[in-house]
Amino acid sequence: MKKNKVVKPGYLFTTGYTNYVFSLLFLLYMFDYIDRMIVGSLFPFIKADWGLTDTQLGSLVSAVYWAIVALTFPISILVDRWSRRRTIGAMAAVWSLATFACAFVGSFGQLLATRTLIGVGEAGYAPGGTAMISAMYPKEKRSWIMGLWNASIPLGSAIGVALGGIIAANWGWRHAFGIVAIPGFILAILFFFAKDYRTVDLIKQKELEDGKVEKKKMSARDMFNEFISKPALMLTYFGFAAMVFVTTSLLTWLATYFNRIYDIPMEKASPKASLVMLLALVGAPLGGYLTDRWRKRQVNARLLFPGLAALVAAGITFLAFSVFTGTEQYIALLFLGIVITSFIPGAAAATQDLIHPGFRATSYALAIVVQNLLGASMAPIVIGWISDKTDLGTALAILPIFLLVAATLFLTGAMFYKRDMSTVEEVPMEVRH
């Protein structure tokens, strides 16, 4: 057998093919967020054209998350029970087409509709990608790989914010949508031909008195209990929501904040804001690496670390928006860009650790529903509404409250982690060509 055909223990594919699939998943997630977040840097240009309020501008971001909330759960069931490869490829094609359509809209209503369609396409990608990564790599490396993969979120957001402001300032905001949509089509086609893992049967095992193991198909009640009976899992979902409220607020409004507070032109404010987001390229992988190292000594590290990261982020955010100004403020925000995303790998891995392998996409979908319903979909509008009533600086100054809530939820969940882990069944994964 050739060396490059050897599948290492704990891996689903060979090393080379694992890297190829991971690269596709990384690039797809990056363009997911480029297409999703580019609109934030286009706010001043769209506002100038159509005279929109901050609340209306915020709704252009929230619309994506409303669609995700509505559809991510049913689509994740398709991912778990049908095919990761086909659903991911189809979703990427839909969100890329919708982004391209944004370049041709003629009114706020039409733009809101196309932004909603982007959310339709993106609804099941994160659950699908998370399930693929959980299957491809050993459990011991799950946080680290999740950290690397989730680094595509700030990278895509930063590229979207930076490119949006630059393209709009030179060629108009419509061109920004059209240009960033094209790569997603190419990646969608490539993923249609990727390998997948065999769909996992929903089987429950029970040890009998004679030592034999009885296997039976899960009932609807068994499926429901697989989630609701685990406090650590439930608290992780809500901790995600509180953190995502803060990160979405910053992704949406930070460039506009620099523009309004410091009178910096958007073509300069956008790259300045994007650098804060780009530092999450350090935060997410670093958080995953540290979490997995800590987990060797502390089994519940995948929730302890997010809790501590949220506490530190709360302090930095308070200093940035309530104490510091100018250079001191920007330095604090750069540190925040690292710390605030370091929670993601551990929390994302926890949603996979604590559930039957046949429900991995569904588990992360529930995390997305909760975080988008209570966090991402609310944040742009809430911050925009407070900004309309007061000012943008006052609106962003409330963010530490949400970080303290997140810390409380994660640290409480850590208390139940070991017990909940002991109830999860191990199921070997097989390749589907």
Regions flagged by a language model, labelled:
Residues 5-14, 198-236:
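Juxtamembrane intracellular "pre-TM" segments in multi-pass secondary transporters
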Residues 39-40, 231-285, 344, 348, ...:
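Extracytoplasmic gate region of multi-pass secondary transporters
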Residues 51, 83, 104-110, 138, ...:
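Helix-breaking motifs and short loop linkers at transmembrane-helix boundaries and internal kinks
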Residues 70-106:
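Conserved MFS/SLC helix-loop-helix module at the cytosolic interface between two early adjacent transmembrane helices
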Residues 86-100, 302-317:
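Structural signature of the two symmetry-related core transmembrane helices
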Residues 114-155:
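Cytoplasmic helix-loop-helix junction between adjacent transmembrane helices
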Residues 149-199:
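Helix-loop-helix hairpin linking two adjacent transmembrane segments in secondary transporters
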Residues 175-192, 394-412:
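Symmetry-related core transmembrane helices of the 12-TM Major Facilitator Superfamily/SLC fold
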